């Protein structure tokens, strides 16, 4: 008679900066109570391929991005920053930066990523010590590619704009921007740019100044500092992981054949190592039950295969807060997460 195969199961708890998951797995699966397997950094080869994506983030990728942003925000120290212009930024945690093309895209996004954006990341790692970061590629409404970057390093606006404009001008994007303005009439100037906040006289003055002094450096960078406002990390995570803008259009150079497997997002090795603190649930049953019963700031959802507890570590009661900070701090040390000064 055929003997039915059976195996023993056990309940596992997985703790992340914004949620706790309780689920069942086969017994003897490894948890973070045991040393992790040795991690190898694999060099890219010609045989390496990423999955085809049709220029859309998968649901799995969106979830991963949300989780990585939560880790980035939680591990980032809160500090005051003095910028290059001597401006003091109070309570800085992470920065959110956007890099655009100042003129019409003339190359595939894959080429721009490999020749320009990758060079930007290399220079930022070398010159600023950036180690913990995540980036995402998107299309604008005009079809141009642009990049969002989140990192725990403060990057001065003028500093990164100078670097980015120098790099993208290898492909002529700054020169074409200046040529466009050099040949622009006042009618074109008004039609191409939104000057609703300026009077007609101010528009003419701005246009004449541009004609005399040149267009200057294009505004190809946007900077947003993220401080300790309530749930701001959740906002950034949601923005980073959102689906593509339905009004955006892909430029004429990008096709599924030449760009269908290019990266739409990526994170540093330090964030890639952040998965969650896993332990056996029987060791934490009383603690989790008390957390659910006594802390009113949390939200609990019961799913078919797991239970999820969502929380904001800054809002939970002090007794639980100290425990979670200790667990996550020990995990940071356990995975050798790089510190940011």
Regions found by a protein language model. Give the residues of each.
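Right-hand nucleic-acid polymerase module
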Residues: 1-143, 154-341
